[in-house]
């Protein structure tokens, strides 16, 4: 099953419905189906949309947890994500700028996912909240073409970010 990487709701829904049709055709034949996903299937994953379409069809579904990108990054770099009483915010960079700003205003630590399109805005907001200096940005963690940037100012301006790009950041003044 191939899903379109678009923001158009109607196109996404068509893709989910097509996946449902294909998956149910195999399940109705008595076959087992595996739906592999990057990260955790219940965390910013296409899986959960297809799951909702299939969950009440009478077929048994077993969802096996995966490792989220930010946990993989923390372990991969030896970068503690959150400690003691710190408050962690997990934010998609695709959210409205005002929401991101409001969340980062109260968070001690942040995970910002899907930064590939809005990096400049995210960087500006992290700087505003004193979270940019020691932030790490990784694109395609654990893959052969992985890119790691420590301190967001160290990224070359012509860096092409991938959809699988995530920032981990900590507030310096707390």
Pin down the residues of each PLM region.
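Class I S-adenosyl-L-methionine
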Residues: 1-60, 148-149, 164-166, 170-173
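Structural signal for conserved beta-strand scaffold positions within catalytic alpha/beta enzyme cores
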Residues: 1-4, 63, 89-92, 112, ...
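Short, surface-exposed amphipathic charged segments that create phosphate/polyanion-binding patches used
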Residues: 12-21, 77-79, 103-106, 148-155
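Electropositive phosphate-/nucleotide-binding environments in soluble metabolic enzymes
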Residues: 13-20, 44, 67, 94-97, ...
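A polyampholytic, Gly/Pro-enriched intrinsically disordered region
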Residues: 19-26, 80-92, 154-166
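A contiguous loop/helix-start segment that scaffolds small-molecule binding in enzyme catalytic cores
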Residues: 33, 104-174
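General beta-strand structural signal in soluble alpha/beta enzymes
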Residues: 35-37, 63-66, 83, 112, ...
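Class I SAM-dependent methyltransferase SAM-binding "motif I" and its flanking Rossmann-like core
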Residues: 42-106, 172
């Amino acid at each position: 099953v191939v899903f379109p990487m678009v923001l158009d709701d109607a196109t996404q829904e068509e893709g989910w419905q097509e996946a449902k049709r294909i998956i149910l055709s195999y399940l109705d034949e008595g076959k087992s189906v595996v739906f592999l996903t990057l990260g955790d299937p219940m965390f910013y994953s296409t899986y959960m949309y297809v799951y909702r379409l299939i969950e009440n069809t009478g077929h048994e579904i077993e969802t096996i947890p995966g490792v989220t990108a930010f946990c993989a990054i923390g372990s991969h770099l030896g970068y503690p994500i959150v400690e003691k009483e710190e408050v962690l915010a997990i934010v998609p960079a695709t959210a409205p700028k005002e929401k991101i700003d409001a969340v980062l205003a109260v968070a001690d630590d942040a995970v910002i996912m899907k930064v590939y399109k809005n990096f400049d805005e995210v960087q500006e907001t992290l700087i505003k909240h004193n979270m940019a200096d020691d932030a790490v940005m990784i694109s395609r963690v654990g893959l052969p073409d992985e890119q790691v940037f420590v301190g967001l100012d160290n990224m070359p301006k012509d860096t092409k970010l991938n959809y699988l790009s995530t920032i981990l950041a900590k507030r310096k003044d707390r």
